[in-house]
């Protein structure tokens, strides 16, 4: 077998009909086929078309050259020291050109009789010269079933045959190399009458044409984007060097099955088959109750628990049950206060990786969701929805026991612990328990004496971030809490609430002004009492 047996040529007119992506696909496959033939020791000279492709020149040939190079291919293969054999009887010649070829395009092909189902093997013939005793490599072979006949490159149907990773048995029998075929989504070649349609090698349904495949996959091949649009990405990847090394890699437990669409590698062929469904969009496992389909049986099993209400994974600490084991693992971090996902920029830790990913958007400036009323921006749409309730006053989450309403579901969940008395967060040093993890974190600072929140202006440290924010307003002069009746502004919300009592008292009893001391006065009063000094007189409001 020579390179001419697998080469494809175009005339100048035919070459002009191809777009950029189709030409890139042609260059890549031709060079890969030449590399394969050379590695087998079957070709010594470098053909003119290969030189043109390596130089980036246009590889078209004069129209007078005979381009039906597939004629009598099977006979020529048997004449050499290597032969291409079938696992079944072969009768007749290989197809010389693809069916339905557009006018003016006569394309020679790599022989692919019954390409969807046949299994071919390369056998070493006795009596071969020593120069041809090189072992065949484990490189994937590309069989061209329908070369660039579509209007777009993603319509070209390419069959990828992955080399079997099993080591050949040590015996006197000729060494064989078997290829297993996997189909890449795209246009399927039309099948002659009385011939079964090509079946997807991934377990599932069979399709006779591209429209049926696209309808079943929901057009996923179009949504794949660059994976199908860029031939060099589709056909890229490094291959094992020799057949023996491929077998040794399998025995050593190394990954040997590679997806040609995304270069992901798997240890088992069954794992590759499952992965291929993400590209084809095939979902053969369907729920009998709602009709929803899944690509794996495990996903269907998890989904069916929604209908049955089964929650087999229970927390040993609090008894809460979950449908998925992963949900139980995330829940158990509440009890352990484990936060293994830490931000490399600010050091903030999170219990879930998804929360860390959202947090990183803050450093990157990624806050695409803006409030229409105040302009505040958020990295999540759910956070924006929660924030908008502060403007509307909406509190859709109501406690069934006491009727208290909340704007967030998490606030209701925490409130319900008041009724149940649940305190799942325990301090490891003193044993004190808390209903919230944030309260436990603040409590642990008492044991360590740590004050992680430090003011950049005066250097004063604080145990709570909220206290630092309030302290910073002393330096900035900011007073965000404004009285709606008189316009007076305050640095802290408690001070505003105390001030608003003046207006409410004036309405109920204009003759008796509110003499209730403010929070600052009471704090100073208590300090003097603790120090043994003479306390200031506490003014009490006049009785009506």
Swiss-Prot record:
Cross-link Glycyl lysine isopeptide (Lys-Gly) (interchain with G-Cter in SUMO2): residue positions: 214
Keywords: DNA-binding, Isopeptide bond, Metal-binding, Nucleus, Repeat, Transcription, Transcription regulation, Ubl conjugation, Zinc, Zinc-finger
Domain of life: Eukaryota
Region (Disordered): 184-222, 508-544
Location of this chain's protein in the cell: Nucleus
Biological process, per Gene Ontology: regulation of transcription by RNA polymerase II
Protein's recorded name: Zinc finger protein 324B
């Amino acid at each position: 077998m020579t390179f001419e047996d697998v080469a494809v040529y175009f005339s100048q007119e035919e070459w002009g009909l191809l777009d950029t992506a189709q030409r890139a696909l042609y260059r890549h496959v031709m060079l890969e086929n030449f590399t394969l033939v050379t590695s087998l020791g079957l070709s010594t000279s470098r053909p003119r078309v290969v030189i043109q492709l390596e130089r980036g020149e246009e590889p078209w040939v004069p129209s007078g050259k005979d381009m039906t190079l597939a004629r009598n291919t099977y006979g020529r293969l048997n004449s050499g020291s290597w032969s291409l054999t079938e696992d079944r009887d072969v009768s007749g010649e290989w197809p010389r050109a693809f069916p339905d070829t557009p006018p003016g395009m006569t394309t020679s092909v790599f022989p692919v009789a019954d390409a969807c189902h046949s299994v071919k093997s390369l056998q070493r013939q006795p009596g071969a010269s020593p120069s041809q005793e090189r072992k065949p490599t484990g490189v994937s072979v590309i069989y061209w079933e329908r070369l660039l006949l579509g209007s777009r490159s993603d319509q070209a149907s390419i069959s990828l045959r992955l080399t079997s990773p099993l080591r050949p048995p040590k015996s006197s029998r000729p060494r064989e190399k078997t290829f297993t075929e996997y189909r890449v989504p795209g246009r399927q070649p039309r099948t002659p009458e009385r011939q079964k349609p090509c079946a997807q090698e991934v377990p599932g349904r069979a399709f006779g044409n591209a429209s049926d495949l696209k309808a079943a996959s929901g057009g996923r091949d179009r949504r794949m984007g660059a994976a199908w649009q860029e031939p060099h990405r589709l056909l890229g990847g490094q291959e094992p060097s020799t057949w023996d090394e491929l077998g040794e890699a399998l025995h050593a437990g190394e990954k040997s099955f590679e997806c040609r669409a995304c270069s992901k590698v798997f240890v088992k062929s069954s794992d590759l088959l499952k992965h291929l469904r993400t590209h084809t969009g095939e979902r053969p496992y369907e729920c009998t109750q709602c009709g929803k389909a899944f690509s794996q049986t495990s996903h269907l099993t998890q989904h069916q628990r929604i209908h049955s209400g089964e929650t087999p994974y229970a927390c040993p600490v609090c008894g809460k049950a979950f449908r998925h084991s992963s949900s139980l693992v995330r829940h158990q971090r509440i009890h352990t206060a484990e936060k293994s996902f830490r931000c490399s920029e600010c050091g903030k830790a999170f219990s879930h990786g998804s929360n860390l990913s959202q947090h990183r958007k803050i450093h990157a400036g990624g806050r695409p969701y803006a409030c229409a009323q105040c302009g505040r921006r958020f990295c999540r749409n759910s956070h924006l929805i929660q924030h908008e309730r502060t403007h509307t006053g909406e509190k859709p989450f109501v406690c069934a026991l006491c009727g208290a309403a909340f704007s967030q579901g998490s606030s209701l969940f925490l409130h319900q612990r008041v009724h149940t008395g649940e305190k799942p967060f325990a301090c490891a040093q003193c044993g004190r328990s808390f209903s919230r993890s944030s309260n436990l974190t603040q409590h642990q600072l008492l044991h360590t004496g740590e004050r992680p929140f430090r003011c950049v202006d005066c250097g004063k440290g604080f145990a709570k971030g909220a206290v630092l924010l309030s302290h910073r307003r002393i330096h900035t002069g900011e007073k965000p809490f404004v009285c709606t009746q008189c316009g007076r502004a305050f640095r802290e919300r408690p001070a505003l609430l105390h001030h608003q009592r003046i207006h409410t008292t004036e309405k109920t009893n204009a003759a008796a002004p509110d003499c209730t001391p403010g929070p600052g006065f009471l704090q100073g009063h208590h300090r003097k009492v603790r120090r043994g000094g003479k306390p200031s007189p506490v003014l009490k409001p006049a009785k009506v």
